Amino acid sequence: MPDSRPDTELSNPQSAKAPLDPHLKALENESIHIFREVAAEFERPVMLYSIGKDSSVLLHLARKAFYPGRVPFPLLHVNTGWKFREMIAFRDETAKKYDLDLIEHINPRGAAENITPFTHGSAAFTDIMKTESLRQALDAGQFDAAFGGARRDEEASRAKERIYSFRTPDHRWDPRNQRPELWNVYNGMIRKGESVRAFPLSNWTEVDIWRYIQAEDIPLVPLYYAKMRKFVERDGMMILAEDPRLELLPGEVRQEGMIRFRTLGDFPLTGAIRSQATTLQEVIAELEIATVSERQGRAIDRDQSGSMEKKKREGYF
């Protein structure tokens, strides 16, 4: 069995660094407490790993929570087949570097029927290749708790979600049927077939995430930093045009400019922003004056009014 206690300083999440400021330290302590609570309370936890910045922070916190042992639960990546190529390369490198138990799941029905965001639209594609696929993977693994990287500052439906978010046997979420959470006491009692989504980053903000990444020197997918990239403008978004599967529509032309991504997902459904931020400090400075949510760059959040809450009620991340 591989040694679970890496002897390189960079592999050790507890390596000596400058002390965290009190705000970030309090957030870190809360997140580590949630990880340990879930691991102690539930029989088969799993961590949902989407490869983005929040997942990278979540993984770092999980490694801290259980160091020097291995992360004691698998990571689940629900792959749609349309992720940025840089994301998949980063995922594989990370799993190997930290000796992670990584599960990849692709909806076999969606793959067989060639469900794509171009042929079926963002709503149907997301329902089949993400929500349905996630339910399949959780059922197959018989997982009773799933860690996620959602934060309350991201979007309205997430703002009212508890740290322990209870799901029915078919993974549905009813926001009216959630339990009170007093201080740091969480009630994890569930009936057979029910499950919990646990969110250790609930009380973090986007700027907190980036400041923590800077303080802890956490690696990220390079797409978060600005560089000259090719893109097309479509439906009010700048879509990366570096994948051969992206076909230009009538009137579209490939452009090139300094762009980056505030959020990562499926490349046809994720819009970039114009930016000159090539370093962590520049990204943080840019965010401190931002006036719109990072999820403005997600096509799936624009499907209809209340679309994210509808997706979450049906079992979405």
From Swiss-Prot:
SUPFAM superfamilies: Adenine nucleotide alpha hydrolases-like. GO terms for molecular function: ATP binding; sulfate adenylyltransferase (ATP) activity. Pathway: Sulfur metabolism; hydrogen sulfide biosynthesis; sulfite from sulfate: step 1/3. Its EC number is 2.7.7.4. It catalyses: sulfate + ATP + H(+) = adenosine 5'-phosphosulfate + diphosphate. It is an enzyme of class 2 (transferase). The keyword Transcription does not apply. Keywords: ATP-binding, Nucleotide-binding, Nucleotidyltransferase, Transferase. Residues 1-21, 298-317 are annotated as: Disordered. One of its GO terms (biological process) is sulfate assimilation. It comes from the Bacteria. HAMAP family: Sulf_adenylyltr_sub2. With CysN forms the ATP sulfurylase (ATPS) that catalyzes the adenylation of sulfate producing adenosine 5'-phosphosulfate (APS) and diphosphate, the first enzymatic step in sulfur assimilation pathway. APS synthesis involves the formation of a high-energy phosphoric-sulfuric acid anhydride bond driven by GTP hydrolysis by CysN coupled to ATP hydrolysis by CysD. Belongs to the PAPS reductase family. CysD subfamily. PANTHER family: SULFATE ADENYLYLTRANSFERASE SUBUNIT 2 (PTHR43196:SF1). Heterodimer composed of CysD, the smaller subunit, and CysN. This is Sulfate adenylyltransferase subunit 2. It comes from Rhizobium etli (strain CIAT 652). The gene is cysD.
